[in-house]
């Protein structure tokens, strides 16, 4: 990893500029090797920071605790807005996630059922806080680099879901189905070992490829007038389009998935567990695939995958059409809406637009800012986007309960009475 020092120097050069404006890759001082190592670093951070949570979900560890995890994400990102978290904390936060992984393994093997359940509750909250802080720091660093790395961070987050999903399926073929406290014992052990290895890799790449120090703090203090940033309200007005798009895409996704599709689809049409696995897999795979094209717009066939925030807002408005589509798939007893292929297409389109529209704002928001130019201002706006993403997820998971107020699940057919006289 010989590019580590050179990459850190390149990043330090960007930090030392009085004004910051990302104009794409034109004029980049980073070599292709440095760019590759940095992109791989941010992919690993995104992947490893979400693996712990995705593994818990994949093992079906008390899904209701998901709401606590989302709450932790929101709280941590808001704290990061008002309290400057040192960049050097990034590898320590990733290390904290690896300790939580070991905690799942130890508590599942040696604790009682009640103690394990209590650990899971506490761990989900801590995962939200720690992962939220790690992602906020990483997005701040990536979005203010010479070559915007925010898109690669988003890509890493997308990889996590399909990565854990595929490993889960492979382990089903090789490990014992024995369960302990309702959770597969062998799968929990191996999945969290993989999470720990990913986190260790991410820590190594962070330390070697990123400048996590604040070398220019003294210079910044000496030039307070030059470094005076715009107020939060001015920064919000300058970036409200990106903030709104981040909120909308995440709110709609978590409102519909998995609460309506696949859960209410399964209740209405008695979908088999195998087909449910396929439907969920469609979400994981297409969410993963859609996060890459926006990062590859230098390739001709992908050049139209990034566009202005105005167009993205229009696209998010059109995305609301998924609401009636998902509801019809649950409440209509017709071969078309019961068809597994149609359901997979519906889920794939929701997932593809989710990953795509989550990545674009981090890539284009800097270019559309009118007032914000300084690196510190870009970092604050990047934190705004992370908060919008987490608040969108939080609102989505809570508003999905609205559909319980309406009878969109088809009634079960009445069974013929049993003749007890025979």
UniProtKB/Swiss-Prot annotation:
Substitution effect: residue 290 to C: Results in severe growth defects in adenosine-dependent proliferation assay when transporter expressed in purine auxotrophic yeast strain
Effect of substituting residue 135 to C: Results in severe growth defects in adenosine-dependent proliferation assay when transporter expressed in purine auxotrophic yeast strain. Abolishes adenosine and uridine transport
Effect of residue 289 to C: No significant growth defects in adenosine-dependent proliferation assay when transporter expressed in purine auxotrophic yeast strain
One GO BP annotation of this record: purine nucleobase transport
Effect ascribed to mutating residue 135 to A: Abolishes inosine binding and transport activity. Reduces the binding affinity of GSK4 inhibitor
Miscellaneous comment as given in the Swiss-Prot or TrEMBL entry: With an efficiency similar to that for uridine, can mediate the cellular uptake of nucleoside analogs used in cancer chemotherapy: fludarabine (9-beta-D-arabinosyl-2-fluoroadenine), cladribine (2-chloro-2'-deoxyadenosine) and gemcitabine (2',2'-difluoro-2'-deoxycytidine). Unlike the mammalian transporters, can efficiently transport the anti-viral nucleoside analogs: AZT (3'-azido-3'-deoxythymidine), ddC (2',3'-dideoxycytidine) and ddI (2',3'-dideoxyinosine). In contrast to the human transporter SLC29A1, has low sensitivity to the inhibitor nitrobenzylmercaptopurine riboside (NBMPR).
Name of the protein this chain belongs to: Nucleoside transporter 1
Organism of this sequence: Plasmodium falciparum (isolate 3D7)
Lineage start: Eukaryota, Sar, Alveolata, Apicomplexa, Aconoidasida
Name of the coding gene: NT1
């Amino acid at each position: 990893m010989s590019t580590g020092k050179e990459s850190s120097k390149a990043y330090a050069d960007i930090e030392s500029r009085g004004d910051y404006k990302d104009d794409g890759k034109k004029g980049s001082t980073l070599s292709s090797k440095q760019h590759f190592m940095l992109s791989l670093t941010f992919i690993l951070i995104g992947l490893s920071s979400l693996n712990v949570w995705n593994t818990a979900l994949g093992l079906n560890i008390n899904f209701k605790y998901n709401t606590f995890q989302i709450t932790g994400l929101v709280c941590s990102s808001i704290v990061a807005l008002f309290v400057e978290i040192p960049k050097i904390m990034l590898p320590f936060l990733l290390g904290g996630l690896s300790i939580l992984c070991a905690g799942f393994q130890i508590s599942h093997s040696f604790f009682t059922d009640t103690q394990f359940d209590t650990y899971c509750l506490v761990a989900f909250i801590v995962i939200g806080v720690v992962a939220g802080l790690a992602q906020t720091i990483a997005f701040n660093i990536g979005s203010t680099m010479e070559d915007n790395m925010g898109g690669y961070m988003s890509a890493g987050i997308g990889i996590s879901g399909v990565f854990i999903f595929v490993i889960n399926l492979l382990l089903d073929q090789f490990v014992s189905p024995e369960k302990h406290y309702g959770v597969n014992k062998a799968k929990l052990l191996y999945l969290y070992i993989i999470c720990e290895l990913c986190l260790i890799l991410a820590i190594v790449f962070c330390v070697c490829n990123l400048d996590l120090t604040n070398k220019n703090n003294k210079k910044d203090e000496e030039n307070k007038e030059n470094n005076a940033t715009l107020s939060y309200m001015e920064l919000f007005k300058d970036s409200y389009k990106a903030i709104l798009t981040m909120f909308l895409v995440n709110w709609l996704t978590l409102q519909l998935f998995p609460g309506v599709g696949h859960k209410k689809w399964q209740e209405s049409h008695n979908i088999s567990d195998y087909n449910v696995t396929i439907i969920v897999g469609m979400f994981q795979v297409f969410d993963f695939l859609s996060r890459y094209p926006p990062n590859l717009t230098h390739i001709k066939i992908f050049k139209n995958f990034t566009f202005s925030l105005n167009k993205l807002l229009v696209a998010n408005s059109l995305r609301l059409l998924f609401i009636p589509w998902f509801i019809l798939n649950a409440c209509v007893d017709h071969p078309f809406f019961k068809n597994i292929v149609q359901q997979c297409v519906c889920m794939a389109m929701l997932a593809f637009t989710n990953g795509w529209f989550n990545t674009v704002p981090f890539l284009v928001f800097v270019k559309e800012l009118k007032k914000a130019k300084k690196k510190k201002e870009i970092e604050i706006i990047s934190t705004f986007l992370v908060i919008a993403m987490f608040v969108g997820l939080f609102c989505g998971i809570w508003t999905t309960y609205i559909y319980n107020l309406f009878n969109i699940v088809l009634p079960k057919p009445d069974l013929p009475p049993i003749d007890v006289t025979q």
